[in-house]
Structure formats: C-alpha cells, structure tokens
Amino acid sequence: MEITITSQTENVLLNRKEIGFSITFTGATPSRKMVHAKLAAMLSAPKDQLVIGSLHNRFGLTEITGDARVYTSAEYLKKIEPEYIRKRGMAGEEEGNADAQDAPSGDAAEAS
C-alpha cells in the first residue's frame, strides 16, 4: 500500500489541516484502520487528532482517493466532527468501545 498526498490545506478557522490523498494497492482493499495508521505515521500526527473523512474506490481499479483532517488538538476534533464521523474515521479505542457496547452480553444471549 502506497499513499500519495495530493493536496494539503491549512484551515486556520477550524484549527486543522485538510489532506487529500490517493492510495495504490495490490490484493484486497485496505481497511480504514490500516489507512488511518499509515496516514498518521506518514504525517507524523497523533492518531487521536486524525480523522478520515471519505474513501472512494472505483470498481476494477486498485486505487483509492480520500480526504482526511488533522486537528491541532483532540478537543477541537470532538467539537467539530460529528460523532458518527469520529467513530467511522478513527482507528483505535473509540472503534473498539463502540463494538463492545453493541455486542450482546453473554447472559442475554443464553436466555434466548
């Protein structure tokens, strides 16, 4: 998986950088979690301040285009981004906690 930055804009009003990128890959389409980790390492950004907005994969091509936003602090990210974007666009703890909350408990599953 190779990521190329296509555009980078500083948005001072919202305290963030807006990044446009393209990914070339072989094999299976990379997951959002993989893209998030690689993009965070490439931009030297903390993972809790980076959110992936969108990923677009065209049928039959091994290329993805997308956009991401890097905030100056995690507080700004939480104030500005809607909750569903934060859950979908961030890898790590928030994603794991959402899965744990949605999963039925063992007692409820046994009662059925």
UniProtKB/Swiss-Prot annotation:
UniProt-annotated stretches for the region Disordered: 88-112
GO function terms (MF aspect): structural constituent of ribosome
Record keyword Ribosomal protein present: yes
Gene Ontology cellular component list: ribonucleoprotein complex; ribosome
A Pfam entry, by short name: Ribosomal_S24e
Acetylation keyword on record: no
GO biological process: translation
InterPro entries, sorted: Nucleotide-bd_a/b_plait_sf, Ribosomal_eS24, Ribosomal_uL23/eL15/eS24_sf
Gene3D superfamilies (alphabetical): 3.30.70.330
UniProt KW keywords: Ribonucleoprotein, Ribosomal protein
SUPFAM superfamilies, alphabetized: Ribosomal proteins S24e, L23 and L15e
Similarity remark: Belongs to the eukaryotic ribosomal protein eS24 family.
Protein name according to UniProt: Small ribosomal subunit protein eS24
Organism: Methanospirillum hungatei JF-1 (strain ATCC 27890 / DSM 864 / NBRC 100397 / JF-1)
Organism lineage string: Archaea, Methanobacteriati, Methanobacteriota, Stenosarchaea group, Methanomicrobia
This protein's encoding gene: rps24e
